[in-house]
Amino acid sequence: MKQPLHIIKIGGNVIDDSEKLSAFLRNFSGIKEPKILIHGGGKIATELAEKMDIPQQMIDGRRVTDAETLKLITMVYGGLISKNIVAALSANGDTAIGLSGADANSVLANKRPANPIDFGFVGDVAAVNSENIDKILQAGFVPVFCAITHDGNGQLLNTNADTMASAIATAMSGNYESFLYYCFEKKGVLEDVENEDSVIPEINPSNYEKLKEEGKIFQGMIPKLDNAFSAIQKGVKAVHILQAEDLSSLILTKRAYGTRITA
């Protein structure tokens, strides 16, 4: 029987709120089975860009990453946010190690084509080195990945953290029973964005299409759900989208929290 591996992506406003992030990391440290954390950090990068007078361009909510912005997000994601998370986890007793996809050649990506939209130094995941990530886990470390990858030729690339989490969970499912969790400030996928209690308990391919047709899945959630379905279809045991504070309760008690994605 394969050993469970928990792959958790933390994002949304939780990263920007020090108290919420600290609470989440305490809960994360309570998970004693092998685990991997993937984090974003867009809001902090945007705030620093304004202070440093680095113009930012967003297209449909996605950041255009020019050369100066790439330097900035590498410093913010791989430096400030990564090291703060690692320091907090170390204080909690976890032997955490902050990584990017370039470290240990963990996540390789292809630069996104300039047509139809040129997003600059943005990469789409091409390969995950599950063998090297497994070596890190076997050595007793807790990998903490920021959403920076590389192209194998020395170029760093900005990569969607949700996609990176899905790709890592999929790659690790060969050796582990992979469980993927998308944690943010909401209780799950909401049928009504104005009603925090309108959590959809389960989404499958059939009701997903229906919910989209009815306009009940807001635009920003669709890429996350697409990544979730991709993971399920490629061998990940289970995918949950839930409130960050409910993570340890879901894993430790097996009770239903948030939205479960099923095939």
Q: Across the structure, where does each feature detected by a protein language model lie?
A:
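C-terminal catalytic "cap/lid" subdomain
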Residues: 1-263
